[in-house]
Amino acid sequence: MAGHSKWANIKHRKAAQDAKRGKIFTKLIRELTVAAKMGGGEPNDNPRLRAAIDKALGQNMTRDTIDRAVKRGAGGDDDGSMDEITYEGYGKGGVAVLVETMTDNVNRTVAEVRHAFSKFGGNLGTSGSVAFLFTKRGEIFFEPGVDEEKLMEVALEAGAEDVEEMGDDGFLVITTPDKSFGEVVDSLRAAGLEFAEAEVTMHPSTEAEMDTDTAETVQKMIDMLEDLDDVQNVYTNASWPAPQEEE
């Protein structure tokens, strides 16, 4: 049941992402540009950039678009300096929320983030109030039909933590430590194992159960946060109730 619950949460998140793909592209380009500016334009020497490229490819961004963003950042042509700030808080029902932002105006950003929390019964907390509930890790998703034995052998040898079947759909997910993510992705590609999506994410150590009404309110808050131009990523420990899943 734990696996099914986890897969339900992943599907829920990805359905929401698909509905906002245009906005996601804008944020991915910003991350690519800043990562290249801060660590250089060579992915093999810049783990943050490599993770950003893998995430962009996982969202079907073209190589040309990625390359342009990287060159703009590496060449110092981005528009001004950006501060990276993570806000922490709780939504309705005690759901823990991390909000990663990239901004050129901190006062504007914190006001907008606080408003989104307050509007839907949540509250913005202090630094460290919920971060301890999350661990940064890589997740690599495979559609049904992949050679599971080969997948497991290659992934674990490259430094993955686990290979797990998600729910009853036949999908597989590889989990990796943050630092091993790029090496595992490279090894899978070298072995001819094509994945559906790969990303570095913040994974909750515990999940907050919600009833349907609470889930609806929390989702509205997440939607509002993700619609903010300065917000890059929103992570929660919400466990979405079964009624929200399609039959």
From Swiss-Prot:
Keywords: Cytoplasm, DNA-binding, Transcription, Transcription regulation. The keyword Ribosomal protein does not apply. The lineage of its organism: Bacteria, Pseudomonadati, Pseudomonadota, Gammaproteobacteria, Oceanospirillales. This is Probable transcriptional regulatory protein ABO_0750. Belongs to the TACO1 family. GO terms for biological process: regulation of DNA-templated transcription. GO terms for molecular function: DNA binding. It is found in: Cytoplasm. GO terms for cellular component: cytosol.
